[in-house]
Amino acid sequence: MTKVYIAGAIPEVGLNLLKEHFEVDMYDGEGLIDKETLKKGVEHADALVSLLSTSVDKDIIDSANNLKIIANYGAGFNNIDVEYARQQNIDVTNTPHASTNATADLTIGLILSVARRIVEGDHLSRTTGFDGWAPLFFRGREVSGKTIGIIGLGEIGGAVAKRARAFDMDVLYTGPHRKEEKERDIGAKYVDLDTLLKNADFITINAAYNPSLHHMIDTEQFNKMKSTAYLINAGRGPIVNEQSLVEALDNKVIEGAALDVYEFEPEITDALKSFKNVVLTPHIGNATFEARDMMAKIVANDTIKKLNGDEPQFIVN
C-alpha cells in the first residue's frame, strides 16, 4: 500500500484525509523529530509531510527509496534542499495563502503591543499593580497616522499594508521588484531600503528568507532608523542580526522591537528577554485554528494528487 510519513502532528482534518487514501505513519514523540528517526520514517515512504521545523537535507532525501513528494506544512520551504529534491525527481510543495491573514493580524498585533506597551502593562497589572490614572503614567506611541515601512510586499506584506491603511498610516515598502498594481490598490509607495529605514516609524519584515537576505538588518541599518522607530519581525529570524539588535536597543538607537521569529530559532538570544520594550512571541504567525486547518488540507490534497498521478497545486521546485 502507498505510504505517507508525517514528521509531526498536524490537525486531524489533514491527517484524516490522508488516512482515507494511504497507509499513514506519523511521528508523535516529544519535541522535534531527530534525524535518525526521520531517516527511518522516510525509508519506504512514497510521501513525506514535513514541518517547517523539519530539516530535509540531502542525507534525508537519500534515505528515501520511493519518495515522490515532500509536502511542507508551511509557507516557507528553506528547511528543505529543494534543488536536490528536484534532481531526484521529487516534488516539493508548500502551503501559501493559508498563512496570509493570520500572520498579517499578528504583525499588527505586535505593532500595537510594543507601541502601546500592552504586554508590559499586563505584567505590571498582575504583579505590583498601579496607583491609578496619571497624566505622565505609562505613555506609549500612537500607531494611527504614523508611517509603516514594509520589507517584502508579498501576500502577507500586502495584507499588513491593508490593515495599516485602516489605521490611516502612510505605507512605504521595499523589495526586489516594484508592484505597481498593489501600490494603486493599497496606496503604498515603493522606496529603496535606506529611504524606508529613515522614514518609517514601524519597520515590519514580512519577507520570505533566502541567503541574500541574511542579516539584511544589521548595525548599519539600525543606525539609519529613527530613534523612535520600532522593528517588527514576523518574517524570518536570520534576516535580522540579533546581536546588532541587542546593541541598538542597549544604546537606544531605536525605541523597541517585537519579534515572532528568531535568528537561532528555537533558541532566543538571552539579552532580548531583558528588555521591557521588546515583545517576544513563539513563532505563532499562522497559529490560528483556521490557518492551521487550511494548511493541513493543502498538504493532504497535494499529497493525494501527486500519489494519484496528478500534478500538485503548490509545487515550489
Curated annotation (Swiss-Prot):
Residues binding NAD(+): E155, I156, A234, G235, R236, D260, H283, I284, G285, N286
Class of this enzyme: oxidoreductase
Signal peptide range: none
Family annotation (Pfam families): 2-Hacid_dh, 2-Hacid_dh_C
Entry-linked InterPro entries: D-2-hydroxyacid_DH, D-isomer_2_OHA_DH_cat_dom, D-isomer_DH_CS, D-isomer_DH_NAD-bd, NAD(P)-bd_dom_sf
Any GO molecular function: oxidoreductase activity, acting on the CH-OH group of donors, NAD or NADP as acceptor
Active site residues according to the UniProt entry: R236, E265, H283 (proton donor)
Domain of life: Bacteria
Keywords, comma-separated and alphabetical: NAD, Oxidoreductase
Enzyme Commission identifier(s): 1.1.1.-
Family designation: Belongs to the D-isomer specific 2-hydroxyacid dehydrogenase family.
Name assigned to this protein: Putative 2-hydroxyacid dehydrogenase SE_1879
